From Swiss-Prot:
One of its GO terms (biological process) is proteolysis. GO terms for molecular function: D-Ala-D-Ala dipeptidase activity; metallopeptidase activity; zinc ion binding. Signal peptide: none annotated. This is D-alanyl-D-alanine dipeptidase. The lineage of its organism: Bacteria, Bacillati, Bacillota, Bacilli, Lactobacillales. It comes from Enterococcus faecalis (strain ATCC 700802 / V583). Its EC number is 3.4.13.22.
Length: 202
């Protein structure tokens, strides 16, 4: 692991995680290149900011559940290769039912570079501290559809309010949202703004 990075659970006591790209449960339908263990890595700076977000969330009765953090460049390349393959319908219904696989790049859901590779971007949601249940957000992680946009129409008032709650928690902790994905937040003062790393999550 590069200097300045760590497993986020080492600093964020009580955080939950489910590193989707290390599993078969993601839009490619298999573990993604570069993810060798089901843990999440980030910069020390993002860990400190997330610790602040944890405090804000806990005051409202919520905990943080992380889906992705640092993403190796090899994983981004794996996504691009997958997006260029003919449709096999293995994951389409769950992740991108309303657009074609070939459109995922042009619509901004799959990119040739990812801020995740700089180590200070996080994909996450909230869960209820008292029950452990995930907070309803109106769409699932990596659902590549307008329902996942911050300005989505067709989600309930409660789900829209929950998204605003997550956004307020994260923005008050130094993060910037991404309009196409309610779960995606980038640390504004990231320590490596021009470096795209490629060490494995191991």
């Amino acid at each position: 692991m590069e200097n300045g990075f760590l497993f986020l659970d080492e600093m964020l006591h009580g955080v939950r995680w489910d590193a989707k790209y290390a599993t078969w449960d993601n839009f490619t339908g298999k573990p993604v290149d570069g993810y060798e263990v089901n843990r999440i890595i980030g910069t020390k700076a993002v860990a400190l900011a997330l610790r602040e977000a944890q405090i804000h969330a806990a005051a409202l009765g919520y905990g943080l559940l992380l889906w992705d953090g640092y993403r190796p460049k090899s994983a981004v390349d794996c996504f691009l290769r997958w997006a260029a393959q003919p449709e096999d319908n293995l994951t389409k219904e769950k992740y991108y039912p309303n657009i074609e696989r070939a459109e995922l790049i042009t619509k901004g859901y799959v990119a040739s570079q990812s801020s995740h590779s700089r180590g200070s971007t996080i994909d996450l949601t909230l869960y209820h501290l008292d029950t452990g249940e995930l907070v309803s957000m109106g769409s699932n992680f990596d659902f590549m559809d307008e329902r996942s946009h911050h300005t989505a129409k067709g989600i309930g008032n409660a789900e829209a309010q929950n998204r605003r709650c997550l956004r307020k928690i994260m923005e008050s902790s130094g993060f910037q949202s991404y309009r196409f994905e309610w779960w995606h937040y980038k640390l504004i003062d990231e320590p490596y703004p021009d470096t795209y790393f490629n060490f494995a999550v191991s």
